[in-house]
Amino acid sequence: MRRTVPRGTLRKIIKKHKPHLRLAANTDLLVHLSFLLFLHRLAEEARTNAFENKSKIIKPEHTIAAAKVILKKSRG
């Protein structure tokens, strides 16, 4: 099984940024899952950008451009 961020550490980080929120027992797992899904979408978009630019390597420019697109879509 893959190692993840310690749950207690993730809960402390969330509480530090939003101390007034009451968190459910599985909130840290949902945040971690959202993070992994974001990374997956970012990697796919960066790969597409690299392919469109006829590059075999994903460069920082591809990742930055992908991040802008993904974050714009995520704002909802």
From Swiss-Prot:
Disulfide bonds: none annotated. One of its GO terms (biological process) is chromosome segregation. Keywords: Cell cycle, Cell division, Centromere, Chromosome, DNA-binding, Kinetochore, Mitosis, Nucleus. SUPFAM superfamilies: Histone-fold. Changing residue 11 to A: Lethal mitotic defects. Lethal mitotic defects. GO terms for molecular function: DNA binding; protein heterodimerization activity. It is found in: Nucleus; Chromosome, Centromere; Chromosome, Centromere, Kinetochore. Heterodimer with CENPT; this dimer coassembles with CENPS-CENPX heterodimers at centromeres to form the tetrameric CENP-T-W-S-X complex, which is a subcomplex of the large constitutive centromere-associated network (CCAN, also known as the interphase centromere complex or ICEN). Interacts with NPM1. Belongs to the CENP-W/WIP1 family. Association with CENPA-containing complexes may be indirect and due to the proximity of centromeric nucleosomes containing histone H3 with those containing CENPA. This is Centromere protein W. It comes from Gallus gallus (Chicken). The gene is CENPW.
